């Protein structure tokens, strides 16, 4: 279930300020953020945002197809190491 249209998309205030500052200076430095719940807006296209996954920051380059999604969708929090093998082997 999505967010109400009258409220608009959520984006962290500090993240929005950093992006607007870089857009005005034509700067494309990596922006670190812990705000995984922030929605990707069209003004973020072309920026690289380092999203925290609980352990480290994962760099995410924003493209047009990502607009409307959340930042956390592109920084997985769990590592999949495969299913456990049968220790007894084939009999």
Curated annotation (Swiss-Prot):
Give the matching InterPro entries: Ribosomal_uS19 (IPR002222), Ribosomal_uS19_bac-type (IPR005732), Ribosomal_uS19_CS (IPR020934), Ribosomal_uS19_SF (IPR023575)
Q: Which UniProt keywords apply?
A: Ribonucleoprotein, Ribosomal protein, RNA-binding, rRNA-binding
Cite the SUPFAM superfamilies for this sequence: Ribosomal protein S19
Q: Name one GO biological process term.
A: translation
Which positions are tagged coiled coil?
none
GO molecular function term, any single one: structural constituent of ribosome
GO cellular component labels: cytoplasm; small ribosomal subunit
Pfam families, A to Z: Ribosomal_S19
Give the protein's function. Answer: Protein S19 forms a complex with S13 that binds strongly to the 16S ribosomal RNA.
> Into which family does the record put it?
Belongs to the universal ribosomal protein uS19 family.
Name listed for the protein in its UniProt record: Small ribosomal subunit protein uS19
């Amino acid at each position: 279930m999505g967010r109400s249209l009258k409220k608009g998309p959520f984006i962290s205030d500090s993240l929005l300020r950093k992006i607007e500052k870089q857009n005005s200076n034509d700067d494309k430095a990596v922006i670190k953020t812990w705000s995984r719940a922030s929605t990707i807006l069209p003004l973020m296209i072309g920026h690289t945002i380092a999203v925290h996954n609980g352990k480290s920051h994962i760099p995410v380059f924003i493209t047009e197809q990502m607009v409307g999604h959340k930042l956390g969708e592109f920084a997985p929090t769990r590592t999949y190491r495969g299913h456990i093998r049968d220790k007894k082997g084939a009999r």
